[in-house]
């Protein structure tokens, strides 16, 4: 993750939510927040490094329930008044709310788990989150670590924006409802149990949309904001001509 992009990503967060209501429409209103982002840069980088060091890998049953507890703490530290660990039949999730007294509410999707890794394939420990000067390609200072891009880096940048807004004495123009899961990397098998809880579902129904922080800034600094996304579905399709009554009753070559 490119270090100075923390500033840019946090400002992008402000721009997205500032567009809902004109609370931060003037540049003068954004100036103290931008200054706070710059002042808290090292703090934000350290927060991400610490988070990368807290590994949760669902496929290896590693880092639970500590990963969920850590996620809840990050939310509370960023200003969420409520952050609760929700147990499921699999790995726990986190449900958090930030009431800014605003007329509109935005949902947030977070994931705190990462893919498994082989340390031998890394130039430095994937849990160390080492800062290196990347020359090829010329990126400058970057963090090397599992989750730096997918997905803790973008999420940490979002949380950094919340810290900066509060530090500048400003109030968010929207309320936030966060749902964070710990099984995204294995296909989110238990997220229905999380989002269908009556209290979580009630909060989500009040949201005008759902935002997922992601690494969408290219090397030229251009940012792409996705306005929609598709989910994942796994299924097994069985075509049985015999039962249908209009096809072969035994196995045939696939070309037929």
Report residues per predicted region.
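Sec/Tat signal peptide C-region and signal peptidase I cleavage site
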Residues: 20-25
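Acidic-enriched catalytic cores of C-N bond-cleaving enzymes acting on peptides and small amides
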Residues: 202-203, 218, 227-234, 246-256
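Bacterial N-terminal signal peptides
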Residues: 9-19
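Acidic/His- and Gly-rich active-site-bordering loop/insert found
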Residues: 26-148, 167-174
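Acidic/histidine-rich catalytic neighborhood of metal-dependent amide-processing enzymes
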Residues: 142, 147-228
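Bacterial N-terminal signal peptides that target proteins for export
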Residues: 1-10
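Short small-residue beta-strand/loop micro-motif enriched in glycine and branched aliphatics
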Residues: 142-144, 243-249
């Amino acid at each position: 993750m490119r270090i100075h992009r923390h500033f840019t990503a946090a400002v992008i967060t402000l721009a997205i939510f500032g567009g809902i209501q004109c609370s931060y429409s003037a540049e003068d209103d954004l100036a103290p927040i931008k200054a706070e982002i710059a002042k808290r840069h090292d703090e934000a980088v350290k927060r991400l490094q610490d988070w990368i060091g807290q590994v949760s890998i669902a496929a290896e049953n590693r880092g639970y329930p500590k990963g969920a507890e850590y996620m809840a703490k990050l939310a509370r530290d960023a200003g969420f008044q409520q952050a609760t660990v929700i147990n499921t039949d699999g790995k726990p999730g986190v449900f958090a709310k930030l009431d800014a007294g605003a007329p509109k509410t935005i949902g947030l999707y977070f994931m705190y788990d990462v893919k498994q890794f082989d340390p031998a394939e890394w130039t430095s420990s994937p849990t160390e989150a080492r800062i290196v000067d990347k020359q090829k390609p010329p990126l400058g200072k970057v963090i090397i670590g599992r989750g730096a891009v997918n997905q803790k880096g973008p999420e940490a940048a979002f949380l950094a924006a919340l810290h900066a807004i509060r530090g500048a004495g400003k109030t968010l123009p929207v309320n936030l409802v966060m749902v964070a899961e710990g099984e995204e990397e294995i296909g989110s098998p238990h997220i229905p149990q999380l989002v269908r809880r009556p209290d979580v579902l009630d909060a989500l129904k009040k949201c005008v949309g759902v935002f997922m922080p992601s690494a969408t800034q290219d090397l030229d600094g251009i940012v792409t904001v996705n306005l929609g996304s598709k989910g994942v579905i796994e299924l097994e399709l069985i075509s049985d001509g015999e039962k249908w009554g209009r096809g072969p009753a035994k196995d045939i070559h696939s070309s037929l």
